[in-house]
C-alpha cells in the first residue's frame, strides 16, 4: 500500500507535473537528483571511475551502490506515507535523492563528494521552491490589520493560517488552504493568512512559535466574535505541537466547515435584506396610496349627489 499511494497521487496530479517542467527550480532539482546515475552511466566518463565489481565494469553499479539506492527507495516510501500533496511527494523524493547522491559521491571519490555537497549548499541558498500562485479567497493580514479585521464584525467567523514562507510544510499546505477558501468563503465565513516569520509580534501575541523544533507551522486558528475558539495543531505543555495531518478532509471535519458554511450563508442573506437599495422601499409607496385615492374620489361623488 505504501508503494501504491505515491503512485496514485502522482497519476492524479499528472497534469500539474507538466507545469513544473517550466520552472527552473524543479529542472535543476531533477538533474541534481540523478547526478550520480548520469556520471556512472555516461560514456567517456564512467570508464575513469573506480568500482568494486568483480568484472571491473565501472559503468555499472556495484553491490554497495545498489544497497544504498534500495535503502533510499524504502525511506522515500515510508516518508511519503504522510505526504498530503504532490509537492510534498516530489519534495521528499528530491531531498532523499540528494542525500543518497552525497553518500555515493563521497564513497566514489572524496573530491566529487565535496563538489556535489558544495553545489547542494549553493542551490539551497539561492533557489527556493515556487510559491502557490493559484486562485484563492484569502485576506492577507499584517501586524496592524489582523486585530482590526477580527474585531470589525463579530458576526463573521474567521479561519486564519499562521505561516512562514521559509517553511516547506506551509508551502505544501498553500494549495490545500486555497481550495478550502474557494469552496467555503462567504459573507459570514472568511479565510485569512498572516506571515509570522515577518511579523514577530503577531507570533508572540497568538502564541504560535516559528521554531522548526516546535512543529507549529502551519497553524490554523478559528475565531468567532473576535476570540479564538480552537486551533490545529494543538500545543502540549512543553510548547510542542501535537501531531496532526493537514489534509482537506481533516480540516473540514475538525472545524465543522460544512455546518459553519450553512450558518454563514444565512448571515449573508440577512445582510442582503438589511442592505437593500432604497428604490425597493420607494416602490411600495404607490401601492399604499392607491386605496386612499379611490376613497377620496368616492367621497367626492357622494358629496356631489348630496348637492
UniProtKB/Swiss-Prot annotation:
InterPro entries noted in UniProt: Thioredoxin-like_sf, Thioredoxin_domain, TMX2, TMX2_thioredoxin_dom
Subcellular localization: Endoplasmic reticulum membrane; Mitochondrion membrane
Basic and acidic residues: bias regions: 269-278
Primary location: endoplasmic reticulum
GO biological process: brain development
GO molecular function, one term: disulfide oxidoreductase activity
Cytoplasmic topological segments: 133-307
Keyword set includes Lipid metabolism: no
Gene3D superfamilies tied to this protein: Glutaredoxin
Summary of the function given for this chain in its UniProt record: Endoplasmic reticulum and mitochondria-associated protein that probably functions as a regulator of cellular redox state and thereby regulates protein post-translational modification, protein folding and mitochondrial activity.
Residues spanning the membrane: 112-132
Segments carrying motif Di-lysine motif: 304-307
Species annotation: Danio rerio
CDD domains membership: TMX2 (cd02962)
Region: Disordered, residue numbers: 268-307
Signal sequence range: 1-19
Name this protein carries in UniProt: Thioredoxin-related transmembrane protein 2-B
UniProt domain comment: The thioredoxin domain lacks the 2 redox-active cysteines, suggesting that it lacks thioredoxin activity. The di-lysine motif confers endoplasmic reticulum localization for type I membrane proteins.
This protein's UniProt keywords: Disulfide bond, Endoplasmic reticulum, Membrane, Mitochondrion, Signal, Transmembrane, Transmembrane helix
Topology of the protein relative to the lipid bilayer: Single-pass type I membrane protein
One GO term describing the cellular component: mitochondrion
Pfam families listed in its UniProt record: Thioredoxin
Limits of the Thioredoxin domain: 132-269
Subunit organization: Monomer. Homodimer; disulfide-linked. Occurs in both reduced and oxidized monomeric form. Oxidative conditions increase homodimerization.
Amino acid at each position: 500500500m505504501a508503494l501504491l499511494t505515491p503512485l496514485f497521487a502522482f497519476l492524479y496530479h499528472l497534469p500539474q507535473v507538466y507545469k513544473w517542467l517550466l520552472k527552473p527550480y524543479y529542472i535543476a532539482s531533477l538533474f541534481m537528483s540523478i547526478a550520480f546515475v548520469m556520471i556512472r552511466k555516461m560514456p567517456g566518463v564512467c570508464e575513469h571511475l573506480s568500482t568494486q565489481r568483480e568484472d571491473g565494469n565501472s559503468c555499472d553499479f556495484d553491490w554497495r551502490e545498489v544497497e544504498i539506492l534500495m535503502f533510499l527507495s524504502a525511506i522515500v516510501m515510508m516518508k511519503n506515507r504522510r505526504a498530503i500533496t504532490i509537492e510534498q511527494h516530489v519534495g521528499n523524493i528530491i531531498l532523499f535523492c540528494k542525500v543518497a547522491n552525497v553518500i555515493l559521491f563521497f564513497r566514489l571519490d572524496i573530491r566529487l563528494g565535496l563538489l556535489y555537497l558544495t553545489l547542494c549548499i549553493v542551490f539551497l541558498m539561492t533557489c527556493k521552491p515556487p510559491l502557490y500562485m493559484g486562485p484563492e479567497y484569502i485576506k492577507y493580514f499584517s501586524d496592524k490589520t489582523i486585530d482590526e479585521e477580527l474585531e470589525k464584525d463579530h458576526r463573521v467567523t474567521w479561519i486564519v493560517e499562521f505561516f512562514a514562507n521559509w517553511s516547506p510544510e506551509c508551502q505544501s499546505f498553500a494549495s490545500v488552504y486555497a481550495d478550502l477558501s474557494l469552496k467555503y468563503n462567504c459573507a459570514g465565513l472568511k479565510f485569512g493568512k498572516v506571515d509570522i516569520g515577518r511579523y514577530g509580534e503577531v507570533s508572540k501575541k497568538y502564541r504560535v512559535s516559528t521554531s522548526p523544533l516546535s512543529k507549529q507551522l502551519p497553524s490554523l486558528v478559528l475565531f468567532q466574535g473576535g476570540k479564538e475558539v480552537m486551533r490545529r495543531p494543538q500545543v502540549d505543555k512543553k510548547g510542542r505541537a501535537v501531531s496532526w495531518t493537514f489534509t482537506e478532509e481533516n480540516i473540514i471535519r475538525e472545524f465543522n466547515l460544512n455546518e459553519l458554511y450553512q450558518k454563514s450563508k444565512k448571515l449573508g442573506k440577512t445582510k442582503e435584506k438589511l442592505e437593500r437599495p432604497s428604490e425597493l422601499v420607494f416602490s411600495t409607496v404607490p401601492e399604499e396610496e392607491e386605496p386612499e385615492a379611490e376613497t377620496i374620489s368616492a367621497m367626492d361623488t357622494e358629496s356631489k349627489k348630496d348637492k
